[in-house]
Design a protein with these regions (language model features):
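Carbohydrate-associated surface elements
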Residues: 147, 167-168
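N-terminal pre-catalytic "stem/leader" segment of glycosyltransferase-like enzymes
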Residues: 1-83, 87, 95-100, 111
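Acidic donor-binding loop of glycosyltransferase active sites
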Residues: 239-250
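Short, hydrophobic beta-strand segments that form beta-sheet elements in well-ordered domains
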Residues: 2-4, 35-40, 140-144, 187-191, ...
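A short, active-site helix/loop in glycosyltransferases that binds the activated sugar's phosphate group
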Residues: 136-161
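Membrane-proximal helix-turn-helix segments that form the acceptor-binding/catalytic region
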Residues: 90-100, 120-141
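Conserved catalytic-core segment of nucleotide-activated headgroup transferases in glycan assembly
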Residues: 170-235
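A short, histidine- and acid-enriched strand-loop-helix "catalytic/donor-clamping" loop
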Residues: 81, 104-120
């Protein structure tokens, strides 16, 4: 049988950002492809000591994995929400029982942290070791694009077991395509608008105009050619958007 690991956020499950959107869409798509959920029972390990939290997450994962049999396939979204120091060991043990394990990658922490001076070196090393050890043993990986694929290959992961997804799917219930778009309309920027993520928004030139959607925007610093519309849930955002072209950034 085909399964996907259904991990649930312990906090901020209804946050007005796209953090959960990609994961939820992957789950919806694989369910349509015949995958069944494999749900680990996890308590709030944020309130536990480091050692106890690691043990609790490993035990929850082990219990979920115990349902799988030889010939089964398991898809895991990466990074895992409830990763532990024992995850690589548990996946190896699962594979030894004849289960194929695949990962679809949303983010690589090592790429996000590599140029940040604020992240301690020991944390960078720990993240790199955890990511590389787990991804190297996967039976297959779905990467963002050829650049991420090349990065993984350079880390020693076999090119033959990596495929590139390209642009992520974005499921929109009851979507209706908007008409009469033109280049004369304001440019749309949607996402995390905080200074540390989108600092350029606070020093744009006078033209063109921009329509902004998302969390973290400092309205007191809004420019004359910027209109802030607030934040929306991911499924509600496409309907609320007003403007012409969208600006892709990160």
């Amino acid at each position: 049988m085909k399964y996907y690991l259904k991990e649930e956020f312990l906090k901020d499950s209804g946050a007005r950002n796209a953090g959960n959107k990609a994961r939820n869409d992957v789950e919806e798509i694989v369910k349509q492809e015949g995958f069944s959920p494999l749900l680990p029972t996890v308590e709030d390990w944020y309130k536990m000591s480091t050692i106890k939290a690691q043990q609790h997450k490993a035990q929850a994962l082990s219990q979920a994995f115990s349902r799988l049999k030889s010939g089964d396939q398991l898809l895991i979204q990466f990074p895992m929400l409830h990763h532990s120091f024992f995850t690589t060991y548990l996946v190896k043990r699962l594979q030894a029982r004849g289960v194929k394990v695949y990962f679809i990658i949303h983010d690589l922490e090592v790429l996000r942290y590599v140029n940040l001076d604020t992240v301690p070196l020991k944390h960078k090393i720990r993240v790199q070791l955890q990511e590389s050890s787990l991804l190297k043993i996967a039976d297959g990986l779905i990467a963002h694009n050829r650049i991420m694929k090349s990065f993984l290959v350079n880390k020693g992961i076999s090119e033959q077991k990596i495929v590139s997804l390209g642009i992520f799917d974005y499921l929109i219930p009851d979507f209706q395509e908007k008409e009469e778009l033109s280049k004369d309309q304001p440019i749309i920027v949607a996402g995390n608008l905080a200074q540390e993520k989108a600092g350029y928004l606070y020093k744009l030139s006078e033209n063109p105009a921009y329509n902004l959607y998302g969390v973290g925007f400092d309205e007191s610093r809004a420019l004359e050619n910027e209109t802030y519309f607030g934040s929306f849930l991911p499924d509600e955002l496409p309907v609320a958007l007003e403007g012409g072209f969208g600006l892709v950034w990160d």
